[in-house]
């Protein structure tokens, strides 16, 4: 899917390092966004151990940020970029009020698989279907633009937030004592 998104946004995407965005020590983490891409993609990222979510929160909130590129003067920029990250590990959400929860959409595979021959045949046709794919995505969005306004990534919270799990496990005890 990420390869298809790259093809749809050819010339308007960049690749990024999610781990660098969540690290307080990497001063060049925003360098990947210097071309101000519409879409940023990381095929195999890791946000399971976010040291400092300040930079990531500011990026997904489209706030004015200071960019430090190697061998250049620092400058300020506001990035309006949609981030896609593939990962096998849950995102560690450290601050429920940070806004990351409101902006994160956790997508899991459906489990519907094609046999290898069908997969190869379909993948060969993707390039010729990009216009139809883009149109379909636009139509789905326009039919219900607010679909994810109240979305909360419950599965991701359950996989990475110990306090959330404690409350879920103890809810009936608290309710009984109340």
Which ranges hold each PLM region?
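Feature primarily recognizes SF3-like P-loop helicase cores of small DNA viruses
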Residues: 1-178
